[in-house]
């Protein structure tokens, strides 16, 4: 199974534009993790705002722009809808009249949109180098080797794969082919409950922290019920006995942004802001989740702040762009919202989608040139869609 990424044609140049062409003929795996230079990148040239508006107006209903919560403000301004990756993919599928789906997010999100939309719709990623370090931590070859290890241990037949939405199309297809389902950070508990009705064990991909937090915090398992499979070690670094004894086989993957938060971050913010409520994403480490007051997805975080009383104080452990927008939004309601960590840190691959890339994309489409199309091959799409459909059927 393979994922085909196309950018066609490559010889078209828009009008003069300060554009870093990393997303054209670039390796999507060339940049991983996060950068913490101390501040967010400077806003792009304000003259580009009018060009973006003009190109979008020219395209009209032919284009539908999706903006992930972690995108820059200058990109979110032009999004028709915002949300998490699964919500945006569903929004795209519900807009069949749009010929072009411009996904302002990262590579696996655009793949999911291509899987769920019709063949007539074309999904475009403004910068092909906007990858995801977590999704890159589980390749099809590595997961196949893991399944072989489970087979050798005699447990593959009783193991159900559950893959996080933040995974490649190949991993989603593997999951569908082997009787598993996809999950989001919002429905991970339901997905695990379903999986344990189908089998005795779960192989959770690729985020170990979401898998562990859901199993222990939400389902009452112990940490001893969980083992971590390291794809860079023979047999995952585990004995056959360890695999047979485990209920949760967690892939050794993580989100580089959420992985930065620590218990020290929690203790420090409590010392600095008396009475603060600490709210973190379940992609954080287990000890951070245990030290927090509340845990939930990006949608949960937004709703929690909407329902919070005036005068309340909140430290949020998730991506900086979203936290900054929430801080600005709720300041008018006398709600103090701060970033959990003192170190200013954002998702560098999300931030590759900037206004210059968006303008280049929209102007190219307006001129009739298809660029940076994301296409998932039919076999991969078929099995990946099966896994997604199982998730949609969860109670």
Question: Where do the language-model regions lie?
Answer:
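Active-site loop-to-helix "anion-binding N-cap" substructures in soluble metabolic enzymes
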Residues: 2-317, 321-395
